[in-house]
A protein has these predicted regions:
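Conserved C-terminal beta-signal and adjacent last beta-strands/turns
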Residues: 31-32, 36-43, 53, 231-235, ...
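Extracytoplasmic beta-strand/coil segments of soluble accessory domains associated
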Residues: 81, 113-154
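Short acidic/polar hinge/loop motifs at secondary-structure boundaries
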Residues: 125, 154-183, 228
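A beta-strand signature from Gram-negative outer-membrane beta-barrel systems
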Residues: 170-213
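Periplasmic-side early beta-strands and strand-to-turn transitions of outer-membrane beta-barrels
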Residues: 200, 208-209, 215-217, 229-321
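Flexible loop and strand-edge segments within Gram-negative outer membrane beta-barrel domains
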Residues: 251-256, 273-279, 293-341, 345-390, ...
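Membrane-embedded beta-barrel scaffold of Gram-negative outer-membrane proteins
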Residues: 338, 342-356, 494, 501-502, ...
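Gram-negative outer-membrane beta-barrel transporters
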Residues: 420, 424-425, 461-466, 561-563, ...
Length: 768
């Protein structure tokens, strides 16, 4: 696992000699055991991240002038800023990776999912980045236990009625100053939903100086983008400054589904289509640098995205509009070298509007008249008409009400250093959210409030001053009389000659979403009896940091163990009987079987002078239920192993830069179809692929402030699937003619969400 002290991924090469081999004749237990043995043997030669921290007085003064208490880490001729939280996490045994704005810039990533897939180690992206719907999953976790936050604002979908909002899709990668990735349980400071990890985005901010950025891009699928930001002081002393920023992105999008996978009547009604995606945002940031140790920041932004999410088995037209306002503020005060206070608050109110049109099917044996052609349509075929999916997915004010939620929160965090032998962090966090959907939706707007208090004790051992120990506990007071107490332990011990040992562990929980508790639609019913998921995770590693002349290397090999109880899942067997005008529907339940995830990690970073950067991140994850029908089977959408990273070369004059970004992964499964004796009949492995992106960057100007970039996505044109879904023949002609029933294997089918084919993009950007 990578620490904050390591060099960043965009300046590195990921070279993999690791692979997992599964013999088809092996038992599942033997295969998993051999997979772990292969991983342990073969990753032992990996070399991960650089760590040579040094904070100078000049850096400290610059930090204070900018109104931040970020730490400065010097890694192989490059300074990397990181938050106090990240620096402390590394010190006390956590695995933390920092991805900088320069890393993102030379990668050319068009959205946050593309950035995370190739630059963030341990990440698997859920759903499809090209469809406008995706989530970030760390170390075998799911959407619920990897928390993405931006400047302290959680981008977690609380479950509005109608449709998921996919909050991470609103992120503009050009406005990211750095990404801090906390692997392992991190709910202590961040609250619910950080049970397996936290991906913290720190955005670009005003700092009292005059500066700006501007860029444009054009490429395959008529993709075009324009972005920029400009910051300037409001007074001569630069105590007050602002930054205005915004971007616009639009693309016709690549093909998502193979036309052969569409149900015949869906295709006949126009379901085979492009998948355009549009996103635009605008915002304003303000800094009041009260004095060198005190700063107040305020940000307001508004993002709108528009995308299609029609599927091959039903929708022929399904545009979504998301509008996402965010207001956040932070106050930082360093009272003395030993005491610091941080206060952060936010308010969000995302909303979504959704249209879903389905094909009308001729149910008359003698045939139907197509109103557009005045021709007779055969029995079971598309009639020429369409209808909205229920009363809330139409076009106008009468049949397209909004869905959404409101959320607000505040965190107060105090860091205190008491003398020579004790440091502690103490604070509180309060979060309140409620559904904000139109009254037509049967969800209710009851507010859910969680208030937590936490303390993190960091004793210093007089007999071992280099040993770092953290013992922390947090209690959350939920609505009613319920409360949750979680804990976290961490340590880091230097051994000798750059070798160290680290480890941490803790507990967390994840609350049910609003719609999982209360919603009622034509396909699903909420379950008010759901209880929170419980997560327990441990991870540890042994590492080495060293430098030999102009070659800097580091090694870390580790592992993790995660156990999830009462995991919240959706049914697939329509266990809610038909009634009240509804067909049979699905619901949600707590899976009583324990989910266990065992993982092996290895990270490598090598820096050779100012020319070469090589990086490697390897994660193997054996994730399965420990009992029941699916005992021992890899859980869905969790790769058995994967490797991601970069290889970067820079010319001697620091003008020409070549970058390769590979991602290689093993098996990844999806399960669905007809359920027989409690087991879905289709289990599809859609993994086992290698995708390589590449960029050519050329920097111009006296300060290399102008950049032209050629980006090639999927350099070798690999055919692969980002996701694998399942559909049925409800709108198929043969089914509607009665040739088979919904209990026939013919009724169900699977289909891949295709990965982006080889494509090209050119961008021009400048800093001023």
């Amino acid at each position: 696992m990578i620490s904050c002290e390591l060099p960043t991924a965009a300046r590195s090469l990921m070279v993999s000699r690791n692979y997992l081999k599964r013999e088809g004749k092996m038992s599942k237990t033997t295969a998993r055991r051999q997979r772990r043995i292969y991983a342990l043997l073969m990753v032992s030669c990996a070399i991960p991240s650089l760590a040579f921290a040094e904070i100078s007085a000049a850096d400290t003064e610059a930090r204070r002038k900018s109104g931040t208490d970020d730490e400065v880490v010097v890694t192989a001729e490059k300074k990397v800023y990181q938050s106090v939280k990240a620096a402390e996490a590394v010190k006390y045994g956590n695995a933390v990776q920092v991805v900088t704005a320069d890393d993102i810039r030379i990668s050319g990533a068009a959205n946050f999912a593309e950035m995370a897939q190739f630059l963030v180690k341990g990440v698997n992206v859920g759903y499809s980045p090209d469809e406008g719907e995706y989530t970030i999953r760390l170390d075998g976790g799911g959407d619920r236990d990897t928390l993405v936050i931006r400047d302290g604002v959680p981008l977690y979908d609380r479950g509005p009625a109608l449709e998921d909002i996919w909050s991470s899709t609103t992120i503009d990668p050009h406005m990211i100053e750095r990404v801090e990735v906390f692997r392992g349980g991190n709910s202590l400071f961040y609250g619910s939903n950080g049970g397996i990890g936290v991906v913290s985005l720190v955005s670009k901010k005003p700092d009292g100086t005059r500066k700006g950025e501007f860029g444009i891009s054009y490429g395959s699928f008529q993709s075009r983008e324009i972005w920029g930001n400009y910051a300037f002081p409001l007074d001569a002393e630069a105590k007050h400054s602002v930054m205005a920023y915004g971007s616009m992105q639009a693309t016709d999008g690549p093909r998502i589904y193979n036309p052969k996978d569409f149900v015949d009547n869906v295709a006949a009604a126009g379901g085979v289509q492009e998948y355009p995606l549009n996103r635009n945002d605008i915002g304003l940031k303000y800094l009041w640098q009260i004095d060198k140790d005190t700063a107040l920041r305020i940000n307001a932004e508004y993002t709108e995205s528009w995308f299609q999410d029609a599927f091959p088995d039903r929708e022929i037209h399904s545009p979504n509009t998301v509008r996402y306002p965010i207001i956040d503020a932070s106050f930082e005060k360093r009272w003395s070298p030993a005491i610091m206070t941080e206060v952060a608050a936010y308010f969000t109110n995302p909303k979504i509007w959704n249209t879903e049109l389905y094909p009308d099917i001729c149910k008359v044996p003698a045939g139907c008249l197509n109103p557009a052609t005045n021709k007779t349509v055969p029995f079971g075929s598309y009639s020429g008409k369409v209808f909205p999916n229920g009363p809330f997915r139409g076009f106008g004010t009468s049949n397209q009400p909004r869905a959404g939620f409101k959320e607000m929160g505040m965190t107060v965090r105090n860091t205190v250093n008491i003398g020579e032998y004790l440091e502690f962090v103490a604070g509180l966090q309060s979060v309140k959210y409620q559904d904000d959907s139109a009254r037509e939706f049967p969800v209710g707007n009851k507010a859910n409030t969680t208030t937590g208090v936490f303390v993190d004790l960091r004793p210093k051992l007089p007999f071992s001053p280099d040993t770092a120990i953290s013992v922390a506990v947090r209690t959350d007071f939920l609505d009613g009389s319920d409360n949750k107490t979680i804990w976290k332990l961490g340590f880091k011990q230097p051994v000798w000659g750059g070798v160290y040992v680290r480890g941490n562990g803790g507990t967390s929980y994840s609350l049910p979403r609003t719609t999982e508790l209360n919603n009622e639609t034509s396909t699903s019913v909420g379950n008010p009896n759901l209880i929170p998921e419980e997560t327990k995770t441990y991870n540890g590693a042994i590492g080495y940091n060293g430098q030999f002349k102009d070659v800097a290397i580091a090694l870390e090999v580790g592992g993790f163990k995660t156990e999830i109880t009462d995991r919240i899942q959706g049914t697939t067997d329509f266990r809610i009987p038909a009634g009240n005008g509804f067909p049979a529907r699905n619901t949600f339940f707590n899976n009583t079987a324990l989910t266990r995830i065992l993982g092996v990690t290895a990270d490598v970073d090598v820096s050779v002078g100012r020319n070469w950067r090589l990086s490697l991140g390897y994660t193997a994850q054996d994730a399965s239920l420990t009992s029941g029908l699916f005992k021992g089977e890899q859980i869905n959408e969790t790769p058995a192993w994967f490797i991601n990273g970069t290889m970067s070369w820079m010319s001697d004059d620091q003008r020409l830069n070549l970058v390769l970004l590979p991602r290689m992964q093993g098996s990844e499964w999806s399960t669905g179809g007809l359920t027989v004796a409690g087991r879905p009949s289709i289990r599809k492995n859609f993994g086992n692929y290698t995708v390589v992106n590449a960029t050519v960057n050329y920097f111009m100007g006296d300060e290399r402030q102008h950049q032209i970039q050629l980006r090639i996505v999927n350099l070798f044109d690999e055919k692969y699937a980002e996701r694998y879904g399942f559909g049925n023949q409800l709108y198929g002609s043969a089914f509607n003619r009665g040739e088979y029933t919904a209990s026939s294997p013919k009724y169900f089918f699977g289909y891949p969400f295709e990965g982006k084919p080889r494509s090209f993009y050119v961008s021009l950007s400048t800093k001023f």
